[in-house]
Amino acid sequence: MITGRTALYGVVGHPVAHSRSPEMQNAAFARLGVDAIYVALPVAPERIDEALRGAHALGFQGLNVTVPHKPRAASLCHALDPVATAVGAANTLRRTRDGWEGFNTDAPACRSLLEAAGVARGSRALLVGAGGAARAAAWALVQLGTELRVAARREEAAAELCRDLAAAVPGADLAAADFEDLEAEADAAAVVVNGTSVGLPGHEGRLPPLRFRADQVVLDFVYGDTDLARAARAAGARLVSGEQVLVRQGALAFTIWTGQPAPEADMARALEAREGAR
């Protein structure tokens, strides 16, 4: 039951109606008996500054941040954890007296899932995209010791990501790649990560069709039955789905907010239940 003492949490994005985070986080609150509610908060890009100030004024205890607000959210926090600082993007905010403290849970979520999928040190990796999610994936791939190539439609964005991460992680092996050579880069890679919003509801555009192999690991940040995920499954590649990333990063966020271990299995079941009801 919602009362005057119920703590407020939410996810900020544009668009955000498709988000599965409310089902997942509310299931976690219910499982552990936390008096809290989590809602989706649609915020246009030009309103993000006032939205974060307003959420703090309204007493929200924590927020997740999704496309396209992660880099801007990091710049609006009064403090950042070391990963968010290195990545230059924040996807989890925790209320403090002075404002928001920013964290990046996408990056450690990616690292743990890719490591579990068998990504080996020294392997070649291709990252597609240069936004907030891509920056988190780049950090994860660098931490795993891969030879990373970053391809984005805007070449300068890929180059900027590489410069920023090289400065934050000395010794990182990464460089920008030509987006026009995406198919060849994917063929040469042992790991392919889609860090773009292609496949997300409300986002136009497609990636060039990529052919995968059974010996590759493919991670798609976008959840659902995307073209990329279907191609990876058809090839027998080891697929790390957007749902897996969502659950893992959400579990890390839950712990940041509550100080309690997240009921990750319950969170995953909440996503499966929604998918089954569609």
Swiss-Prot record:
Its biological purpose: Involved in the biosynthesis of the chorismate, which leads to the biosynthesis of aromatic amino acids. Catalyzes the reversible NADPH linked reduction of 3-dehydroshikimate (DHSA) to yield shikimate (SA).
Residues bound to shikimate: 19-21, 66, 91, 106, 223
HAMAP family according to UniProt: Shikimate_DH_AroE
SUPFAM superfamilies noted in UniProt: Aminoacid dehydrogenase-like, N-terminal domain (SSF53223), NAD(P)-binding Rossmann-fold domains (SSF51735)
Top EC group: oxidoreductase
Active site: 70 (proton acceptor)
The keyword Oxidoreductase is assigned to this record: yes
Transmembrane segments: none
Family matches, as InterPro entries: Aminoacid_DH-like_N_sf (IPR046346), NAD(P)-bd_dom_sf (IPR036291), SDH_C (IPR041121), Shikimate_DH-bd_N (IPR013708), Shikimate_DH_fam (IPR022893)
Family named by the database record: Belongs to the shikimate dehydrogenase family.
EC number: 1.1.1.25
Catalytic activity line of the entry: shikimate + NADP(+) = 3-dehydroshikimate + NADPH + H(+)
Domain of life: Bacteria
Biological process terms in GO annotation: amino acid biosynthetic process; aromatic amino acid family biosynthetic process; chorismate biosynthetic process; shikimate metabolic process
Binding site for NADP(+): 129-133, 221, 242
Summary of subunit composition and partner proteins: Homodimer.
Pfam families linked to this entry: SDH_C, Shikimate_dh_N
UniProt protein name: Shikimate dehydrogenase (NADP(+))
Keywords: Amino-acid biosynthesis, Aromatic amino acid biosynthesis, NADP, Oxidoreductase
Pathway info: Metabolic intermediate biosynthesis; chorismate biosynthesis; chorismate from D-erythrose 4-phosphate and phosphoenolpyruvate: step 4/7
Any GO molecular function: shikimate 3-dehydrogenase (NADP+) activity
Residue ranges the record marks as coiled coil: none
